[in-house]
Amino acid sequence: MNSQIKNKAVYWGTGRRKTSVARVRLIPGNGLIKINGRSGDDYLNFNPLHLNSIKAPLQTLGLENSYDILVNVFGGGLTGQADAIKQGAARALCELSPDNRKPLKTEGHLSRDPRAKERRKYGLKKARKAPQFSKR
């Protein structure tokens, strides 16, 4: 699968989700995750859903214990940040080898999730919630 691996030490990728932006670096290592200088478990409050989301692109390619993930992330909440990190890691893996693109794309790790908070409209209480209607 990895026939054209480049001899580079660091692979970069940027991911976005909602208002979160993650700059992800992949370094050959043993599967360590560091987010904003803290361990991945600590930063994500030991939430297995978020941790599995981050590891998903590496697991798709069978490389979960081959690379360390170093991340700078800002904006949004934990779910948005975890998905931004996932997309950034997938993009970094594409930089590692062009052969990685197809399996990552079929799993949906490279596509940006367009869902975001809908804006509030005037005359309404929230984005779609209208004030109580009174017939008389």
Swiss-Prot record:
UniProt-annotated stretches for the region Disordered: 97-136
Q: Which GO terms describe its cellular component?
A: cytosolic small ribosomal subunit
Q: Which InterPro entries match?
A: Ribosomal_Su5_D2-typ_SF, Ribosomal_uS9, Ribosomal_uS9_bac/plastid, Ribosomal_uS9_CS, Ribsml_uS5_D2-typ_fold_subgr
SUPFAM superfamilies per the UniProt record, alphabetical: Ribosomal protein S5 domain 2-like (SSF54211)
GO molecular function, one example?
structural constituent of ribosome
User: Residue ranges under compositional bias (Basic residues)?
Assistant: 117-136
Keywords recorded for this protein, A-Z: Ribonucleoprotein, Ribosomal protein
Give the record's GO biological process terms: translation
Entry's family note: Belongs to the universal ribosomal protein uS9 family.
Name of the protein: Small ribosomal subunit protein uS9
Q: Which organism is it from?
A: Prochlorococcus marinus (strain AS9601)
